[in-house]
């Protein structure tokens, strides 16, 4: 795999998102508890974050825990919260001396979130807010519909009576991120699952059948090459192509 060639390709997306799906099913295949799948998924995410940075991609969003995931068994939710606590500690240890900004998307005011997770998340965002390089956007207690409603209500509270697309974009959790180019959802499921609904309006999607803990760097490269082979039209078509086809 020629990383430098890939990295220097002008078609490389600037902002990608990962729906890290299939941890539980991966564990079940091996006769293990679902929580073990989350542990392996968490370890894989750390490797993939570094690889994404090495590729020169500017922004990475990761769907870690949805607003609907509270409906899972309490033991699993508790385990995930402990993983997030560990994840935030790792980010502080590994990233504070690098040009990496952390922006966490999701409802941090939710009383169901453990106070230690909430406090560490807010502190990490504050400590890295001056960084101008790579942006890592973990989405925790996040829902796309909830984010849109929050943006609308924030606009109203500011006295806006005519809300534009730019107003909405400015009030999303992702306001300081680049436009979303590419979404990868592992496990083969083909659903948005309430993830970045506004941001992904014209994003490209890719659905590898691999469960997240088994998704490799080679899998990511394959996904990126697939993205770069596509023609992004954003609802339009070039005049010469229209003439050829009609």
Show where each model-derived region lies:
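Flexible, compositionally biased loop and terminal segments
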Residues: 1-246
């Amino acid at each position: 795999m020629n990383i430098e060639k890939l990295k220097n390709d002008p078609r490389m997306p600037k902002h990608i998102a990962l729906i890290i799906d299939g941890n539980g099913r991966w564990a079940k295949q091996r006769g293990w508890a679902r929580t073990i799948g989350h542990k392996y998924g968490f370890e894989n995410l750390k490797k993939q974050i570094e690889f994404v940075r090495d590729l020169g991609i500017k922004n990475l969003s990761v769907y870690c825990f949805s607003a609907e995931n509270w409906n899972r068994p309490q033991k699993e939710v508790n385990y995930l919260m402990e993983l997030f606590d560990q994840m935030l500690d790792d980010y502080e240890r590994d990233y504070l001396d690098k040009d990496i900004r952390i922006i966490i998307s999701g409802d941090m005011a939710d009383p169901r979130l453990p106070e230690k997770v909430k406090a560490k998340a807010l502190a990490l965002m504050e400590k890295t807010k001056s960084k101008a390089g790579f942006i890592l956007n973990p989405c925790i207690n996040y829902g796309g519909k909830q984010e849109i409603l929050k943006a609308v209500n924030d606009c109203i509270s500011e006295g806006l009576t005519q809300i534009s697309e730019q107003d909405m974009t400015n009030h999303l959790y992702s306001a300081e991120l680049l436009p979303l180019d590419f979404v990868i959802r592992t496990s083969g499921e083909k659903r948005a699952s309430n993830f970045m609904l506004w941001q992904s309006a014209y994003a490209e999607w890719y659905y590898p059948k691999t469960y997240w803990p088994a998704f490799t760097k080679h899998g990511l490269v394959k996904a990126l090459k697939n993205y770069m082979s596509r023609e992004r039209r954003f609802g339009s078509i070039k005049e010469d192509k229209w003439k050829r086809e009609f």
